[in-house]
């Protein structure tokens, strides 16, 4: 996706910090190149895809395309479908109240039923030091990844700085 020259330019901007960090990132409204640049600049070592179905109409963001792109720039990729939301539940979201209702239900069901996956992310964060979770929406408050991030903060052993890219 990136030429050697483009990759060198992005690498030059890369954060040298190796401290523990956790990011959330959405790909809505940006190109695959811009998305990958954000990961490189923030020295992300592992991308966790929390979409239920990692298929995208947007070029570069379906599971295999994204996995291959990440691996080509030495970023590991894993898919954690257990933390996704079924697409039929997302079909009638028109207001912020609709999103809030959906995410409140998600928090009470999916996240409670999948604490093992949250603990898995915690363990991966300690292993890789700098990780990100990803989904589609640009704005975290209208994406379930914000609820995943909030639930991670509640884990007793969670002591990691979080920010949205």
Task: Please give the residue ranges for each predicted region.
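Residues lining hydrophobic/aromatic ligand-binding pockets adjacent to catalytic sites
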Residues: 1-165
């Amino acid at each position: 996706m990136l030429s050697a020259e483009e990759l060198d330019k992005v690498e030059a901007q890369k954060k040298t910090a190796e401290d523990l960090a956790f990011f959330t990132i959405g790909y809505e409204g940006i190109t695959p190149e811009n998305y990958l640049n954000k990961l490189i600049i923030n020295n992300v070592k592992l991308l966790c895809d929390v979409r239920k179905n990692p298929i995208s109409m947007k070029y570069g963001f379906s599971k295999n395309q994204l996995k291959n792109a990440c691996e080509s720039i030495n970023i590991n990729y894993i898919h954690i479908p257990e933390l996704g939301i079924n697409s039929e539940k997302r079909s009638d979201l028109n207001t912020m109240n609709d999103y809030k209702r959906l995410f409140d239900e998600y928090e009470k069901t999916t996240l409670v039923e999948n604490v093992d996956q949250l603990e898995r992310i915690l363990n991966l964060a300690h292993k890789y030091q700098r990780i990100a979770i990803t989904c589609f929406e640009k704005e975290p408050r209208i994406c379930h990844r914000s609820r995943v991030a909030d639930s991670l903060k509640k884990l007793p052993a969670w002591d990691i700085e979080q920010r949205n890219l």
